[in-house]
Amino acid sequence: MYYLMNKNTVVAAFEKQPATAFSDEVLFREVERTGKLPFGFEDINAWLNSRKSSKHNAHLRKLMREMGCDDNEGFIRVTHAATINDTFWIKSDRESLTWEQISLYRNPFTETISRLAFEGVGLYAGDFSSTSPELSCEGSFRKCFRKEKQRGSFGSDIFIYKRGNDLGPGLEPYCEMLASEIAAIISPDNYVPYRTVLLHDKLASKCNLFTNEQHGYASFSKLMKAKSLQDVFDFFDRIGASQAFREMLVVDSLCFNQDRHAGNYGVLFDNDTLEITGMAPIFDLNLSMLPYVSMKDFDSIGDKLFEYAPVLGDDFTRIGQMAMNDTLHDRVKTICDFSFAFRGDDVFPPERVKAMESIIRRQAQALLSSETLRTKDVFFSQNAADDEQYQGEVRAAVKRFHIFADAVDQMELGSNVFKSDCVSSDTVQYIFEMNGYELTVDFLKRKILIADDRLQAVTPDALQDAAPAVYELYDKLFGLFTNMNQY
């Protein structure tokens, strides 16, 4: 028997299921519920899988496999499913462990695991008798957790170090630091400060942990299945956090954050009662500030921004405008002449800092505008202009199609012209292609059959001599097309 615990309180009991002929995976089934279950809990197997960091990180998946904790039974044995997000954990009925012995907040981390998770190098000889948060955290970037003597901005002695992408220029730590400067202005009471540091000779962003034994974190993905952005806003409005949610949207709009999925924002709650106490601070900003845009691309930044879109909403500028209110208006106003404290280095050069400042200032002015704007209106994009022209041509062609369809329905042509509703005609194809209105060919093919379908492409005079009835149709269509030019 196994017990799902919240600190030292049993909230559920479950047991291993008998093996099946078609699965080697050890599964569990619930036996009893005796307390409040974690947010988003559906069944014990899904909950265990959601605790594993390996679902996001291929390197940690390999590490966990070598440690024997990649399956649910091994994961319980090694980690007890403890995380730094809440105070839930698991023990077997053969163990006399207490929360005080398991808590990641109270006990030291395994340096070997921490370093392996952060550096991604081969296994070192080490003691895996204790564990570390790396095995049960979310996110695809290499990160590690360290306990330090001096506590941070949230009063915790636990700090998170997160690296950049090994396959790219590695600008993400800089971007996270810069975006947190914007967050400090827009959401001064509800953001996570980041700074850049070197750890084991690797650049990383560093922040303080905002959870503790009293207050846990639940991502929005565990709270509800929203069908629209309005559903998300309504949720935060119900818990009294609509202003905090607006602030997050504006920060993401100004910083062009592409990664605000439902796992990257959520709520804080009381670990004992599971009562929601407010919105979690704004965090996870490493995909803000255009980390994958080259310096050359800044010359045509509108084309790059045309390729991007936020996760919440469909346009960076528009969603920022929609989130604005009087309080945010005053804060965004200060961004119009904003400069970063960080002025650049060899990796993130000063000219890139200046380029980002220019973009953010222009975006701030757009958010303050009374005119409804989208990103393409603020940052000119030739690609967007070409796309808009194309869409305009399509709309005009569709309009011509409907005008033509109505006109054909009203034509009074000889009975020898129409014989079927579903047979095609080379002559009709010729009439259309001759005038460049291919969009309506299929319509007419379905509509009529020319009496002499053997006719090939001919001149109008030859058509009149060979098939007067067909020419009558051609003449009326040609006149219709000529009149369509005004549309």
What are these regions (language model features)?
Residues 1-250, 254-256, 268-393, 400-402, ...:
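Phosphate/dinucleotide-binding and metal-coordinating scaffold of catalytic cores
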Residues 24-31, 37-38, 435-472, 479, ...:
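Intrinsically disordered, low-complexity regulatory segments enriched in Ser/Thr/Pro
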Residues 261, 266-268:
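Conserved protein-kinase catalytic-loop segment immediately C-terminal to the catalytic Asp
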Residues 332, 391, 395, 405, ...:
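Low-complexity, intrinsically disordered short peptide segments enriched in small/polar/basic residues
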Residues 385, 397-398, 406-408, 452, ...:
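Intrinsic disorder/low-complexity segments
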Residues 406-447:
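Amphipathic, interaction-prone secondary-structure segments
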Residues 408-409, 414, 418-421, 459-470, ...:
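Function-determining sites in protein domains
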Residues 486-487:
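Cys-based phosphatases of the PTP/DUSP/CDC25 superfamily and their flanking regulatory architecture
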